[in-house]
Regions:
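Short secondary-structure junctions and interdomain/linker hinges
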Residues: 25-28, 48, 118, 122
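N-terminal regions immediately upstream of nucleotidyltransferase
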Residues: 1-40, 86-95
Length: 227
């Protein structure tokens, strides 16, 4: 691994990096740490074998950009292109039901396994745990969208009530194909400390045009804070 990679630093060094960024931009260290993890997981997701079928829809929270921190309330919202399940064109009610079940099972099985493997491959398996949303009962046997939670080991002792060290991915099939653009994403640590390598992989993120406004607000946020 690169010597200066954030993830191979000691806990004390990681704390120093996060505190330095906090001093620079005034956001709490917990938020800076979570931002780095959300960025990293998003980059890893777009290396998965079916990444060409995924679109990052953003996190709805940034519409409330006045409350900077609310960026973190919903972390990674992903749409899966229905062509992955062999469905095209206008769908009947029955096909939509089939699509939702297929998507739900895909997230619980294939997506979960592929993401677990990738987290191992990039050397982060000891730093976080990953768990899929379980099947529900009756009509909700196959939750759709289905969530996956990634809990990372925070290097900060104190926890903020409104900001847990958990990243929630919400993954669902969409019946509409949305316009998207390819973007790269940068964490607040990367923005403020270019000397520290934070990317485990610098992938291109297919971002829904609606989600792009989310990314733009994130970048606006970075500009506001990195003056």
């Amino acid at each position: 691994k690169h010597m200066n990679n954030y993830f191979s630093l000691t806990i004390e060094e990681q704390q120093q990096v996060l505190r330095a960024v906090e001093g620079h931009i005034g956001l709490p260290v917990q938020a800076i740490e979570k931002d780095l993890w959300v960025t990293t997981i998003l980059q890893i997701v777009f290396t998965l074998p079916f990444a060409d079928k995924l679109i990052f829809k953003g996190g709805t929270s940034l519409s409330k950009v006045g409350k900077y921190i609310s960026r973190f309330s919903e972390d990674i919202d992903l749409a899966v292109d229905r062509s992955l399940f062999g469905l095209e064109g206008d769908l009947t009610k029955k096909q939509i039901k089939k699509l939702r079940k297929a998507s739900s099972v895909f997230v619980r099985e294939d997506f979960f396994m592929a993401l677990s493997d990738a987290i191992k491959k990039y050397g982060l398996a000891t730093l976080c745990t990953i768990e899929p949303e379980q099947d529900g009962k009756g009509d909700n046997t196959y939750p759709e969208p289905r969530k996956i939670w990634i809990t990372y080991k925070s290097v900060i002792q104190s926890e903020l009530n409104y900001l847990k060290p958990v990243i929630m991915l919400e993954i669902g099939a969409r019946s509409l194909v949305e316009p998207y653009t390819m973007n790269k994403v940068k964490s607040l640590v990367a923005e403020n400390f270019p000397a520290i390598q934070t990317n485990v992989v610098d992938s291109e993120i297919a971002t829904a045009v609606a989600g792009k406004t989310f990314l733009e607000k994130v970048f606006l946020l970075h500009e506001l804070f990195s003056v």
